[in-house]
Swiss-Prot record, chain A:
Cellular component GO terms held in the UniProt record: cytosol; plasma membrane
Subcellular location: Cytoplasm, Cytosol; Cell membrane
Cysteine disulfide partners in this protein: none
Known function: Component of a complex required to localize phosphatidylinositol 4-kinase (PI4K) to the plasma membrane. The complex acts as a regulator of phosphatidylinositol 4-phosphate (PtdIns(4)P) synthesis.
Gene (UniProt): hycc1
Listed name of the protein: Hyccin
Predominant subcellular localization, coarse grouping: cytoplasm
Family: Belongs to the Hyccin family.
One BP annotation, GO: protein localization to plasma membrane
Sequence ranges of Basic and acidic residues compositional bias: 393-403
Amino acid sequence: MLAMDQGVVEEWLSEFKTLEETAVYNYAVSLKEKGSLVPALYKVIRENYSDLLEPVCHQLFEFYRSGEPRLQRFTLQFLPELVWSYLSVTAARDPHCSGCIEALLLGIYNLEIVDKDGQSKVLSFTIPSLSKPSVYHEPSSIGSLALTEGALANHGLSRVVYSGPHLQRETFTAQNRFEVLTFLLLCYNASLSYMSGSSLQSLCQLSSRVSICGYPRQQVRRYKGISSRLMVTSEFLVQLITGIHFALCNGEVDLGSKALDDVLYRAQLELFPEALLVGNAIKSSLHGASLKSNKEGTRSIQVEITPTASRISRNAVTSLSIRGHRWKRHDAVDLGSPDELTEIAEVDEGICTQASGAQSSPPTIVISSSAGGAAAGAGKLAGKGLRRLTGRSSKEKDKEKDAATGMDQLTRKQAAVRAMSENLELLSLKRLTLTASQSVPKSGSLSLSRTASAVFSRSFEQVSNVFSGNQPSSRASSPTSNHVAEQDEGVAYLDHISPAHQHRQRSPTISIHVTSDL
Amino acid sequence: MTARKSGSRLETEIERCRSEGQWDKIPELVRQLSAKLISNDDLGELLLGEAKLQQYLKENPIKQGSSPRGPRPRLQEVRKHLTAALDRGNLKPEYMQEASLIMAKLCYVEADYREALNQYSRVNLDEMQLVGAPVYRLSMIAEAYATKGLCLEKVPMASPSLSNSIADKDQEIITCYEKSGDIALLYLQEVEKALSAGIQNRSPKPGPVTQEQELGYFLETGLQRAHVIHFKNGNLTRGVGRFREILRAVETRTTQNLRMTIARQLAEILLRGMCEQSYWNPLEDPPNQSPLDDPLRHSPHTKDYALSRRPRIYSGENLFCPQENTEEALLLLLISESMANRDAVLSRIPEHNNDRIISLQSASLVYDLLTIALGRRGQYEMLSECLERAMKFAFEEFHLWFQLALSLMAAGKSARAVKVLKECIRLKPDDPTIPLLAVKLCIGNLHWLEEGERFAKIVIDMGEKAAEFRAKGYLAIGLVYSLKATDASLRGMQEEYQKKALSAFQRAQSLSPTDHLAVFYLALQLAISRQIPEALGYVRQALQLQGDDVHSLHLLALLLSAQKHYHDALNIIEMALSEYPENFILLFTKVKLETLCRGPEEALLSCKRMLQIWKSCYNLTNPSDSGRGSSLLDRAVADRRQLNAMTLPDFSDPETASHASSSLSGSEPVSPLFPLSSLYSPPPPKATESNQRRSSHAFCDHAPHRRFSSASNLPDAFFHGFDSFIGVCSVHATSIAASRVEQALSEVASSLQSSAPKQGPLHPWMTLAQIWLHAAEVYIGMGKAAEATACTQEAANLFPMSHNVLFMKGQVAELRGNVDEAKRWYEEALSISPTHVKTMQRLGLILHQLQRYSLAEKILRDAVQVNSTAHDVWNSLGEVLQAQGNDAAATECFLTALELEASCPILPFTIIPRTL
């Protein structure tokens, strides 16, 4: 160690000894300005054999004991380095030289496990529950939660203990080693915002080394320190990962990502589910985000203006909208209370696929209208109405298109025309559709299997042409010919054209009267 | 909102259209209006101008991040209208203001920023009334502030040299945006209120209900740009404050999506940028100096304005306000999750692919953040429930499935975890960790050895692709074979499996020579096969690799005891205990060794120490405690004299013994109900489980923070693990069945008895019962029946239907000479656990005494089938055969017994847990 560093450290040692009680606070504030002190102290800790180690450890402990938050944080910043020092010495089975570091670690631990009154500290927190109102929400507006046992048990807020109470420890044994170290890391993580960059770097290095020493990856990382394996526990790794996460997002991108990879590697080898869980989550959540290394001191977070409208197209069936679906059933559909109806009416549900949205023009089941005359104009877009959700690929649908027979189209269209003329002025499709379905009591009338056998055609215009071409209708055999190979798993036909959609004009609904008339 | 008293229906209608954004109706209404009064012409101009501008903006929406380009021909008309309205000056003052605002907006759209700013200064935005303003005007004012902010941003500084003025300008811009955001929120709330009132008022004819209002460029900017600037400037405190303000406002349909995004972003910041010490809760003022902010910029932390009307916020009594960054993050994430769940795209047709991806991505992020927040606090049970809800999104998505599997594993739901892992293997067949995790679970509590073998074979079949996991795969299959060998009932099968296990372990060790686990298990397997010297060599190697591994040390001690070097073994145990002072398995072995080496008094001292340790570890109330601290446990612990010197006056008299014991068991369940609630904390050293990498086979598996362990797992583990402690070597599959029977019986029994039910997880009580039974055994060795009875009774209070307890009762009876009673107890024990070899052996001996030789022979032969290395069984069998006159067979048995006894450890090797 350079003489200069030694001098700095010695000066620091002597300064504090002569300090009075009252001047402690100012001294703490002034510590920040001593730029060369912290690196010098790091050097002392790294070289185990320095004689300054003992007085330094003692002084750091005094800092911690003083209770002044700044001084405590000053001590805490060295924690990763101290832990590494202790672990590496233990692994090398070097009995001496780690005594003072052990004493320091145990001292901090014993101080932290009791609160001001000397009682054992129990760290707990409240698990929020959506069923209780909070400053950010009201329970009624959030949808009903699943009625699981867990949800019932959590009804109301529960305070849960996550650490403690702990026993005082006099020495390190193999049994309590990781309990103590995990708790110390917990304390360290509680003050992460105050830790400087060098401390975070040291944390990342600790994580890397602890994870890979003695494993094949050590060759990859080319770390030449110790070569025997260090035992770790799952909770210890979880606390390390928590710290690494903070470091990753606050400037230490390279070291942090390496450390995270190494810890995950170790967790995989040891089959620790907790560490894998949190590590994978961090990795996946940072996947898209580009983290640039910021300069020291700047902690800017990238935030963009997000569009307030939902980006999901209106046609996609979502959990919310599926409530309003009618399923293929042979009995009357039960749609629940009228309240639900109005709600559904407000919700954008639906299966109307956009003509424009998809890359390939979606196959449409056009039960379209253009019967001549009055219904013609209205019929134009009716076809976009009836669609079907299936799980099959569009290829099959294309095949179906080709196999379309005019007959089916015809029959349906005729019926559709009739229905349409009834419903021409109705603009709120959903409501109507639902009310219509409710008023359809005929059993079996909702056999959408018939509509299921509807024909696909590529475009609405084609169909209307076809339709106008084949006037005579043979209505006979339509229900039977089921061209569609797709099995209809009870997906409803819901004709539905969202009024707000730009590409469509207001179009009439084709209610399921259609099928019932067949 | 108080509606303005409007004179006519027409005006109301106009107001309504303006509020709801139905600009296409305006021209018609204007025509009707101008038919009425001439003076309304100006108003008509104003309305037309506004309508046209709004329609233009609707058709050519300004995108975020782009700047308006310049004058547009279509907007000429608008300008004409507005100029007409303004110039004539006949309008009422409010309408004049409105006209100016619209004019300013037009100027912005045409990129004439200075003019817009002029307009705003003329109007003096700050003085426009919010209270009593009609709904549309709120929107106008909000947009005006936003536009003003935008203009200020775009206009370059007049004199950029003064840094103060830059800061001031920034502050002004931010204030504009913040005001705009607040008023926009207020406007949206008012609109929703009006709409819902309107729906009720009007006849329910189906009219087009504008479901979601589009916010438009200006309102969106106003809502969001403030915090964007805060974050860009590094002012996290104010950014977070702004987020919170937006979230605290009562939600409306239009803001739902925004709230979801903001909630998630705020949760991200709380988890990534804040720690517990730098947190302040939403209801208090932000700290003056926070490490979160950029130290180079000094911006004021408090708002410097106050609006006359504010948006409604969530309020009430007992509102939950988070006190910690994790709590707040959890709350926000739960809110965000419920919203994201609603938007889960369920349809699977390819045209909805993009939608699926979008909803998956946003939900995935929310679930990842939930994992991070809950993982920090060890709440894996809740996490597994949340991740189950994520399954809606998870079709063919490996990440979510895997996370679910891991969370189930961490929460202790092993059976489900294995099933989910199967699905993960299907989704990602090339990843060796997944089958290894499955094997770990199968070998643990579940004891699904067939499945385990299949999973392990998957890893082995991967060959080189598994890279560093190959050794682990061999290790896993070796363990499976080893456990199968222990389970097997035919000797031939046992040997075959043992051979397979050995070769697998050897392969593992050769693949990864620095892994002490492979070497250790090789040693263990050799020990089980009674190849003691080789086992010793390997275990020493293992200790060289990892010097303080508790199981290696234990195995070493057992091996030394097998070689009859009891003192050396005891030394090793004591050394191990110095590193693992609260490890009960080691302590049990110590008791046994001390009984042999140093005499039973020492052993009793150890028992007493164990009781002390137990009491300090598990700070629980003994269920038989009558509340006065007078239980035997407390007295034993408090008594300084050695246990054997203690006179137990209550128990020395056989008559009063039963009375006293019943008084103990019949004591009213006054034990202060240990709150089952969250304040129960798991015992710190967690004795043998948890912090060790391989949790003890006898106890629950590895999740240390599990609070409410599923009751079904533990008793199984206990009861068949308990076997191993008392000396039966097998961890039999049948003993698992026995343990289930015991559990059922004990539940029934405890409901009949009046003893208080045990609180919390069972393993502390199991340990306590084991300690008592060990003490009883030592007393039996000393010949002290009364004390032995007392100890057994203590154990019986805890687990009355345990076959170990029954066995011990039988032994006590034997000691007292009550052969019939002993026989009864043994038979009861066997009915619960038919493969308990020790019981079988003693029963066989009794039957031999009673001269029922053939029955004795049968029972002893069965025992030998179960465990072919039990030398005392062989010995007894030899005696029985001899008594029957079958000398040749008897000789064979005796020889076998001698051989086995030569290498018999003090406790069977199988008490050492075999887990991955």
